[in-house]
């Protein structure tokens, strides 16, 4: 974990809970969905069920705590029971923007936070794959060193950050009503 006490605000991205001793406010919550370019889907066809991903070009985020050759997926009908799909990624990257760019270029199917990809879906540059399945829930928290002595400028910025993020996320998702 980053040295939270060294900064006024530390942004922590997580797909799980974190240390309960951390003083933090949730800034953002999103679901990760699978997307591909229309060109890729014309060329390879769209998967009809999660197991079909084994036959597709998958673009996968590589993180220390993740198994890169497997996607966990949840269906809204059974949100507590994920399924695990073995995949053979054609691209492993440690940066979401690289995977998004590769998907836009027709390289394959990737998992991206819904609010991040909503503008591309709205413009038709990407298409959601295997809806309503999701590949995870992501949260971002703003951690502060202490609640007692938070400077007013920090409190004002934190309130602004949370409200602006909420508005931008709502705007992105509203623009993409079919997400």
Tell me what each language-model feature is.
Residues 1-93:
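Acidic, Gly/Pro-rich loop/turn segments at junctions of secondary structure
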Residues 22-23, 128-131:
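Short beta-strand/turn micro-motifs at beta-sheet edges
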Residues 25, 51, 100-101, 155:
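Alpha-helical segments flanking ligand/cofactor-binding loops in enzyme cores
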Residues 35-36, 94, 112, 161:
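A conserved hydrophobic position in a structured secondary element of the catalytic/binding core
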Residues 81-128, 135:
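Hydrophobic hinge/microswitch elements
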Residues 114-119, 123, 133-179:
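C-terminal effector-binding regulatory domain of bacterial HTH transcription factors
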């Amino acid at each position: 974990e980053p040295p939270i006490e060294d900064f006024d605000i530390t942004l922590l991205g997580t797909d799980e809970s974190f240390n309960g001793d951390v003083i933090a406010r949730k800034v953002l919550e999103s679901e990760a969905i699978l997307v591909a370019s229309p060109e890729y889907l014309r060329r390879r066809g769209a998967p009809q069920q999660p197991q079909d991903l084994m036959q597709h070009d998958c673009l996968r985020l590589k993180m220390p705590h993740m198994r890169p050759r497997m996607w966990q997926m949840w269906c809204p009908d059974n949100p507590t029971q994920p399924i695990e799909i073995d995949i053979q990624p054609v691209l492993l990257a440690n940066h979401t923007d690289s995977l998004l760019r590769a998907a836009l270029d027709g390289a394959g199917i990737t998992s991206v936070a819904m609010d991040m990809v909503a503008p591309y879906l709205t413009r038709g540059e990407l298409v959601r794959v295997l809806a309503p399945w999701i590949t995870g829930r992501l949260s971002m928290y703003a951690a502060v060193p202490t609640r007692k002595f938070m400077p007013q400028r920090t409190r004002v910025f934190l309130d602004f950050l949370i409200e602006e993020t909420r508005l931008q996320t709502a705007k992105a998702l509203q623009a993409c009503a079919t997400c």
